[in-house]
Amino acid sequence: MTYTLLDPDELARRAAQVIGERTGILKHDVAVVLGSGWSSAVAALGSSRAVFPQAELPGFITPNAAGHTGELLSVRIGAHRVLVLAGRIHPYEGHDLRHVVHPVRTACAAGARIIVLTNAAGGLRADMAVGQLVLISDHLNLTTRSPLVGTHFVDLTNAYTTRLRKLASDTDPTLTEGVYAAQPGPHYETPAEIRMLRMLGADLVGMSTVHETIAARAAGAEVLGVSLVTNLAAGITGKPLNHAEVLAAGTASANRIGSLLADIIARF
Protein backbone atom coordinates (compact mmCIF):
# COMPACT_ATOMS: atom_id res chain seq x y z
CA MET A 1 0.00 0.00 0.00
CA THR A 2 1.84 3.12 -1.21
CA TYR A 3 1.25 6.84 -0.67
CA THR A 4 4.13 8.28 -2.62
CA LEU A 5 3.14 11.96 -2.39
CA LEU A 6 2.88 12.16 1.39
CA ASP A 7 5.59 13.60 3.60
CA PRO A 8 7.71 10.62 4.78
CA ASP A 9 7.21 11.43 8.45
CA GLU A 10 3.45 11.80 8.04
CA LEU A 11 3.30 8.51 6.15
CA ALA A 12 5.26 6.85 8.96
CA ARG A 13 2.83 8.23 11.53
CA ARG A 14 -0.12 6.84 9.57
CA ALA A 15 1.48 3.42 9.36
CA ALA A 16 2.32 3.51 13.07
CA GLN A 17 -1.30 4.32 13.87
CA VAL A 18 -2.44 1.26 11.92
CA ILE A 19 0.11 -0.90 13.77
CA GLY A 20 -1.33 0.31 17.07
CA GLU A 21 -4.84 -0.51 15.91
CA ARG A 22 -3.91 -3.94 14.56
CA THR A 23 -1.80 -5.01 17.55
CA GLY A 24 -3.69 -3.27 20.32
CA ILE A 25 -0.38 -1.82 21.53
CA LEU A 26 0.09 1.92 21.33
CA LYS A 27 3.88 1.88 21.77
CA HIS A 28 6.56 -0.60 20.76
CA ASP A 29 9.86 0.51 22.30
CA VAL A 30 12.16 -1.79 20.27
CA ALA A 31 12.10 -2.79 16.61
CA VAL A 32 14.01 -5.57 14.85
CA VAL A 33 14.59 -5.81 11.10
CA LEU A 34 15.43 -9.35 10.00
CA GLY A 35 17.61 -9.56 6.92
CA SER A 36 18.43 -12.33 4.46
CA GLY A 37 18.60 -15.69 6.19
CA TRP A 38 17.29 -14.29 9.49
CA SER A 39 13.54 -14.85 9.03
CA SER A 40 13.84 -18.44 10.26
CA ALA A 41 14.87 -16.99 13.63
CA VAL A 42 11.42 -15.52 14.26
CA ALA A 43 10.17 -18.52 16.23
CA ALA A 44 13.03 -18.20 18.72
CA LEU A 45 12.13 -14.59 19.52
CA GLY A 46 8.95 -15.60 21.34
CA SER A 47 5.21 -15.93 20.75
CA SER A 48 3.57 -13.23 18.66
CA ARG A 49 0.66 -11.09 19.79
CA ALA A 50 -0.14 -10.22 16.18
CA VAL A 51 1.14 -11.20 12.74
CA PHE A 52 0.18 -9.62 9.43
CA PRO A 53 1.71 -8.75 6.04
CA GLN A 54 3.75 -5.55 6.00
CA ALA A 55 2.12 -4.67 2.67
CA GLU A 56 -1.17 -4.03 4.49
CA LEU A 57 0.38 -0.96 6.13
CA PRO A 58 0.45 2.49 4.50
CA GLY A 59 3.64 2.99 2.49
CA PHE A 60 4.95 -0.58 2.85
CA ILE A 61 6.04 -2.71 -0.09
CA THR A 62 6.29 -6.50 -0.15
CA PRO A 63 9.93 -7.70 -0.28
CA ASN A 64 10.83 -9.72 -3.37
CA ALA A 65 14.22 -11.10 -2.35
CA ALA A 66 14.26 -14.76 -1.32
CA GLY A 67 14.39 -15.24 2.44
CA HIS A 68 12.33 -12.14 3.24
CA THR A 69 8.80 -13.16 4.31
CA GLY A 70 7.39 -9.64 4.46
CA GLU A 71 5.54 -10.15 7.75
CA LEU A 72 5.25 -7.81 10.72
CA LEU A 73 5.02 -9.31 14.19
CA SER A 74 4.41 -7.88 17.64
CA VAL A 75 6.38 -9.80 20.28
CA ARG A 76 7.03 -9.32 23.98
CA ILE A 77 10.65 -9.88 25.03
CA GLY A 78 11.32 -9.27 28.70
CA ALA A 79 9.91 -5.86 29.56
CA HIS A 80 9.87 -4.75 25.93
CA ARG A 81 7.18 -4.60 23.28
CA VAL A 82 9.06 -5.45 20.11
CA LEU A 83 8.11 -4.90 16.48
CA VAL A 84 9.67 -7.56 14.28
CA LEU A 85 9.95 -6.80 10.57
CA ALA A 86 10.63 -10.14 8.92
CA GLY A 87 12.31 -9.01 5.74
CA ARG A 88 13.20 -5.75 4.04
CA ILE A 89 13.18 -4.25 0.57
CA HIS A 90 16.41 -3.17 -1.12
CA PRO A 91 17.39 -0.36 -3.47
CA TYR A 92 18.56 -2.97 -6.00
CA GLU A 93 14.92 -4.08 -6.37
CA GLY A 94 14.26 -0.70 -7.95
CA HIS A 95 12.83 1.02 -4.88
CA ASP A 96 13.41 4.62 -3.89
CA LEU A 97 15.28 5.05 -0.62
CA ARG A 98 12.25 6.65 1.02
CA HIS A 99 10.49 3.30 0.59
CA VAL A 100 13.53 1.34 1.78
CA VAL A 101 13.72 3.21 5.09
CA HIS A 102 9.97 3.64 5.58
CA PRO A 103 9.68 0.59 7.89
CA VAL A 104 12.36 2.00 10.20
CA ARG A 105 10.73 5.44 10.20
CA THR A 106 7.41 3.76 10.99
CA ALA A 107 8.96 1.82 13.86
CA CYS A 108 10.31 5.06 15.30
CA ALA A 109 6.90 6.68 14.91
CA ALA A 110 5.43 3.68 16.75
CA GLY A 111 7.65 4.47 19.73
CA ALA A 112 10.83 2.50 19.07
CA ARG A 113 13.90 4.13 20.60
CA ILE A 114 16.13 1.16 19.77
CA ILE A 115 16.37 -0.31 16.26
CA VAL A 116 18.11 -3.67 15.82
CA LEU A 117 19.23 -4.14 12.21
CA THR A 118 20.33 -7.58 11.08
CA ASN A 119 21.74 -8.73 7.78
CA ALA A 120 23.56 -11.46 5.94
CA ALA A 121 27.10 -10.45 5.07
CA GLY A 122 30.18 -11.69 3.35
CA GLY A 123 33.15 -12.02 5.66
CA LEU A 124 36.31 -10.25 4.50
CA ARG A 125 38.67 -11.79 7.03
CA ALA A 126 40.12 -15.26 6.64
CA ASP A 127 39.53 -15.92 10.35
CA MET A 128 35.77 -15.51 9.95
CA ALA A 129 33.51 -18.54 9.71
CA VAL A 130 30.12 -19.12 8.12
CA GLY A 131 27.46 -18.85 10.85
CA GLN A 132 29.46 -16.35 12.89
CA LEU A 133 27.67 -13.30 14.31
CA VAL A 134 29.50 -9.97 14.17
CA LEU A 135 28.43 -6.71 15.81
CA ILE A 136 28.66 -3.77 13.42
CA SER A 137 30.92 -1.12 14.94
CA ASP A 138 30.77 1.30 12.00
CA HIS A 139 29.98 1.35 8.31
CA LEU A 140 31.21 2.44 4.90
CA ASN A 141 28.32 3.72 2.79
CA LEU A 142 29.65 2.89 -0.67
CA THR A 143 26.21 3.22 -2.25
CA THR A 144 26.95 6.99 -2.42
CA ARG A 145 23.32 7.67 -1.46
CA SER A 146 21.46 8.91 1.61
CA PRO A 147 17.77 8.53 2.53
CA LEU A 148 17.80 12.08 3.89
CA VAL A 149 16.77 15.02 1.72
CA GLY A 150 17.36 18.61 2.72
CA THR A 151 19.35 20.14 5.54
CA HIS A 152 19.47 17.08 7.80
CA PHE A 153 23.04 17.10 9.07
CA VAL A 154 22.84 13.98 11.22
CA ASP A 155 25.86 13.07 13.35
CA LEU A 156 26.96 9.48 12.69
CA THR A 157 29.99 9.48 15.00
CA ASN A 158 28.35 6.80 17.15
CA ALA A 159 25.97 5.39 14.54
CA TYR A 160 26.02 1.92 16.11
CA THR A 161 25.69 2.77 19.76
CA THR A 162 28.60 1.72 21.97
CA ARG A 163 26.22 1.11 24.88
CA LEU A 164 24.18 -1.43 22.93
CA ARG A 165 27.26 -3.18 21.58
CA LYS A 166 28.54 -3.58 25.13
CA LEU A 167 25.22 -5.05 26.24
CA ALA A 168 25.41 -7.52 23.36
CA SER A 169 29.01 -8.44 24.19
CA ASP A 170 28.11 -8.91 27.84
CA THR A 171 25.36 -11.29 26.73
CA ASP A 172 27.76 -13.31 24.56
CA PRO A 173 31.47 -12.55 25.07
CA THR A 174 32.35 -14.52 21.92
CA LEU A 175 30.81 -11.83 19.71
CA THR A 176 33.34 -9.86 17.69
CA GLU A 177 33.00 -6.47 16.01
CA GLY A 178 33.61 -5.28 12.47
CA VAL A 179 33.08 -2.50 9.95
CA TYR A 180 30.28 -3.16 7.45
CA ALA A 181 30.68 -1.98 3.86
CA ALA A 182 27.43 -1.45 1.94
CA GLN A 183 27.48 -1.96 -1.82
CA PRO A 184 24.52 -1.28 -4.13
CA GLY A 185 24.32 -4.85 -5.52
CA PRO A 186 22.58 -6.97 -6.63
CA HIS A 187 25.72 -8.57 -8.05
CA TYR A 188 28.40 -9.81 -5.69
CA GLU A 189 31.78 -8.14 -5.52
CA THR A 190 34.84 -9.10 -7.53
CA PRO A 191 37.98 -10.37 -5.76
CA ALA A 192 39.66 -7.06 -6.64
CA GLU A 193 36.83 -5.12 -5.01
CA ILE A 194 37.13 -7.29 -1.91
CA ARG A 195 40.84 -6.50 -1.70
CA MET A 196 39.98 -2.80 -2.00
CA LEU A 197 37.37 -3.05 0.77
CA ARG A 198 39.87 -4.70 3.08
CA MET A 199 42.33 -1.87 2.42
CA LEU A 200 39.56 0.60 3.32
CA GLY A 201 39.10 -1.12 6.68
CA ALA A 202 35.98 -3.18 6.02
CA ASP A 203 35.43 -6.54 7.69
CA LEU A 204 31.99 -7.30 6.25
CA VAL A 205 30.18 -6.55 3.01
CA GLY A 206 26.49 -6.52 2.12
CA MET A 207 23.72 -4.67 0.33
CA SER A 208 21.55 -3.21 3.10
CA THR A 209 21.46 -1.66 6.59
CA VAL A 210 23.32 1.64 6.15
CA HIS A 211 20.34 3.64 4.84
CA GLU A 212 18.14 2.30 7.65
CA THR A 213 20.82 3.25 10.17
CA ILE A 214 20.94 6.80 8.84
CA ALA A 215 17.14 7.09 8.99
CA ALA A 216 17.00 5.69 12.51
CA ARG A 217 19.69 8.05 13.78
CA ALA A 218 17.92 10.97 12.11
CA ALA A 219 14.80 9.99 14.07
CA GLY A 220 16.77 9.96 17.32
CA ALA A 221 16.84 6.18 17.81
CA GLU A 222 19.81 4.09 18.89
CA VAL A 223 20.99 1.35 16.52
CA LEU A 224 22.43 -2.10 17.11
CA GLY A 225 23.68 -3.76 13.93
CA VAL A 226 24.31 -7.50 13.75
CA SER A 227 25.69 -9.35 10.72
CA LEU A 228 25.46 -13.09 10.15
CA VAL A 229 28.46 -14.20 8.11
CA THR A 230 26.85 -16.39 5.46
CA ASN A 231 29.84 -16.73 3.14
CA LEU A 232 33.44 -15.68 2.83
CA ALA A 233 33.74 -12.93 0.24
CA ALA A 234 34.89 -13.36 -3.34
CA GLY A 235 38.47 -14.52 -3.77
CA ILE A 236 39.00 -15.78 -0.23
CA THR A 237 38.00 -19.41 -0.78
CA GLY A 238 38.15 -19.52 -4.58
CA LYS A 239 34.54 -20.76 -4.72
CA PRO A 240 31.71 -18.97 -6.60
CA LEU A 241 29.06 -17.16 -4.54
CA ASN A 242 25.29 -17.67 -4.64
CA HIS A 243 22.21 -16.59 -2.67
CA ALA A 244 21.23 -20.16 -1.81
CA GLU A 245 24.20 -20.48 0.55
CA VAL A 246 23.13 -17.27 2.27
CA LEU A 247 19.69 -18.70 3.03
CA ALA A 248 21.13 -22.07 4.03
CA ALA A 249 23.48 -20.47 6.55
CA GLY A 250 20.58 -18.55 8.07
CA THR A 251 18.38 -21.62 8.35
CA ALA A 252 21.17 -23.63 9.96
CA SER A 253 21.75 -20.88 12.55
CA ALA A 254 18.10 -19.90 13.10
CA ASN A 255 17.49 -21.13 16.65
CA ARG A 256 20.89 -20.00 17.90
CA ILE A 257 20.73 -16.49 16.47
CA GLY A 258 17.08 -16.00 17.38
CA SER A 259 17.66 -17.01 21.00
CA LEU A 260 20.74 -14.82 21.27
CA LEU A 261 18.88 -11.86 19.80
CA ALA A 262 16.08 -12.33 22.33
CA ASP A 263 18.61 -12.52 25.18
CA ILE A 264 20.28 -9.30 24.02
CA ILE A 265 16.98 -7.43 23.69
CA ALA A 266 15.91 -8.56 27.16
CA ARG A 267 18.95 -6.68 28.53
CA PHE A 268 18.03 -3.36 26.91
Swiss-Prot record:
SUPFAM superfamilies with a match to the protein in the record: Purine and uridine phosphorylases (SSF53167)
Pathway the protein acts in: Purine metabolism; purine nucleoside salvage
EC number of this enzyme: 2.4.2.1
GO terms for biological process, alphabetical: nucleoside metabolic process
Enzyme class: transferase
Record organism: Mycobacterium leprae (strain TN)
Family, per entry: Belongs to the PNP/MTAP phosphorylase family.
Protein name: Purine nucleoside phosphorylase
Taxonomy, superkingdom: Bacteria
GO cellular component: cytoplasm
Swiss-Prot/TrEMBL keywords: Glycosyltransferase, Transferase
Biological function: The purine nucleoside phosphorylases catalyze the phosphorolytic breakdown of the N-glycosidic bond in the beta-(deoxy)ribonucleoside molecules, with the formation of the corresponding free purine bases and pentose-1-phosphate. Cleaves guanosine, inosine, 2'-deoxyguanosine and 2'-deoxyinosine.
PROSITE patterns, alphabetized: PNP_MTAP_2
NCBIfam families reported for this sequence: PNPH-PUNA-XAPA, PRK08202.1, PUNP
Keyword RNA-binding attributed: no
Keyword Nucleotide-binding in record: no
